[in-house]
Amino acid sequence: MNAKHAPFRHYLDLADARLGSQVVAVSDEWFAPASRMLQAGEPVWKEGVFDDSGKWMDGWETRRKRFEGHDQAVIRLGVPGVLKGVDIDTRFFTGNHPPAASLDGCFCTEGDPDDSTSWSEVLPAVGLQGDSHHYHPIDDERPWTHLRLNIYPDGGIARLRLYGVPYRDWSSLPPGTALDLAAAVNGGRALACSDQHFGRMGNLLNPGRAINMGDGWETGRRRTPGHDWVIVALGHPGSIEAAVVDTLHFKGNYPESCSIQAAFVEGGNEARIEAQSLFWRELLPAQKLEMHQEHRFERHLNALGPITHVRLNIFPDGGVSRLRLFGSPQLP
């Protein structure tokens, strides 16, 4: 399966270190640490660069196994989630990649797994090629807190992407609790946008403030009439009480203004939602923006009641680092 036919790539990467995901156990990392697999950036090749262990590689690499068994790494997800698909990426590993790999999962209510933990198969053993992406859909609705990557018998993996939906027990929230319903860690997801030439739309929902301009959503320079936009599905229906539009790091390329539309959508696919968004009600009327600044809007918001989706419009183009939508989830 290639990237074009892997629609699950639009979901959140639950293994992203920026979410707090980390390697908590590893059988071997002689040549390169397993933590590199979880980096958000694309792997790179550094010609002629060596360290004390050998050739520097941007990923996890174990030593050559001279006895029975295989290598494995256990990842604690920053937020529990249901997997929709995975990418086992071996870019730049040629001649030192594993010929096969598999994934197991577990759900720990407290702490990390131990010898008594029961693991379930998430992805059976699949063949791997060197210097390649390996996309595999996952049809399993069980949530996981930890994933175990098994490589057979040894070798190197550049990146492990675990695409899915964060799991949260919304019924356990006290009534009236307000939180960022658009946050990726709460299940928020960017569905569609007019353009993402310089920065991916999903970056808008990342935790914390942006680390640089590349950690936001940025469109190309608009040379035709109109404006740019992005549609976000909230992690849970709710009533919005405050909106934050952050232009941190965007100075000569921030939008002149923005507005937000919203709706309560039941059913329909992404194409239908995109078409309908033109006619959604106005949550936030057009507001002026400043460069490199966090803009918080409360009194400007219209009271629309519970919503499920928003459309952020930016005029005419530019970059926004974060979108936050604080409100109370609509609970049963």
UniProtKB/Swiss-Prot annotation:
It holds the Pfam family Allantoicase. HAMAP family: Allantoicase. GO terms for molecular function: allantoicase activity. It comes from Pseudomonas aeruginosa (strain UCBPP-PA14). This is Probable allantoicase. Belongs to the allantoicase family. It catalyses: allantoate + H2O = (S)-ureidoglycolate + urea. InterPro entries: Allantoicase, Allantoicase_dom, Galactose-bd-like_sf. The gene is alc. GO terms for biological process: allantoin catabolic process; purine nucleobase metabolic process. Pathway: Nitrogen metabolism; (S)-allantoin degradation; (S)-ureidoglycolate from allantoate (aminidohydrolase route): step 1/1.
